[in-house]
Amino acid sequence: MKKVSIMGVQYKVFFNSNDSRLEYADADGITDSTTKEIHIAQFENCPNSISNLHDYKQKVLYHELIHAFLYESGLDSNSDWARNEEIVDWFALQHKKIDSVFGEID
């Protein structure tokens, strides 16, 4: 378990979680804004899985962190776009490129 600060709010991140909500939601990760917890599923190598599970786990983590940021910013409760999985995925996948441009400007 790791702790991270999301806009000043402490979240606990659980890796290799066997939380039942993951299975119920058919999800590889979940963010619970009520308990301030992020759960990332346990991934196992098998013939049907992707080869680089470490990178995939990072993508799931980034996705869940974006959910937490949107919730803590208040955007999650104001409109549906902040809960839209495609928007969350886009930010999770593009955050390094965005940060790089910000770094060029500073």
Which residues does each predicted region cover?
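Short, basic alpha-helical nucleic acid-contact segments in DNA-binding proteins
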Residues: H95-S100
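Short alpha-helical catalytic segment bearing the HExxH-like zincin motif
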Residues: Y56-E64
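A glycine-rich, hydrophobic loop/mini-helix early in the fold
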Residues: S77
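Active-site scaffold of zinc-dependent metalloenzymes
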Residues: K2-D55, A68-E72, D80-Q94
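Long, well-structured alpha-helical subdomains associated
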Residues: G103-D106
